[in-house]
Regions:
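Active-site-adjacent structural elements that line small-molecule/cofactor binding pockets in enzymes
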Residues: 1-107
């Protein structure tokens, strides 16, 4: 399907971006076109990141991370490209599990 991932766009820009896409679809004769809007935040880490971890943009407890993702959804994002920080494969897998077990149920 069709979609767009605005790179570096702030939440307040999403409604305008979506409007531009809808108008372009209308002008192309596709008034009922459906499309996905993605969000790709910087690196994420569930919990308090260790001091020796490279910087992560989306950090905090599961409630905070879920609130941030819900805010993205409220402005029109419906596809989330998340990438988690981890110093080892085990830590990375722990982050993935924490997202599935602790954050996803809050979405």
């Amino acid at each position: 399907g069709d979609g767009y991932i605005p790179m570096g766009a702030s939440r307040d820009q999403y409604p305008n971006i979506i409007d531009i896409i809808r108008r372009a679809a209308d002008e192309a004769g596709r008034p009922d076109a459906t499309f996905d809007i993605g969000i790709m935040p910087g690196w994420a880490y569930i919990g308090d990141p260790p001091d020796d971890l490279p910087p992560a943009w989306l950090t905090g407890d599961p409630e905070h991370i879920a609130a941030e993702l819900r805010a993205d959804r409220e402005v029109g994002a419906n596809v989330f490209h998340l990438k988690f920080r981890g110093r080892t494969i085990e830590e990375y897998l722990d982050q993935l599990a924490a997202f599935g077990e602790q954050v996803r149920p809050l979405l």
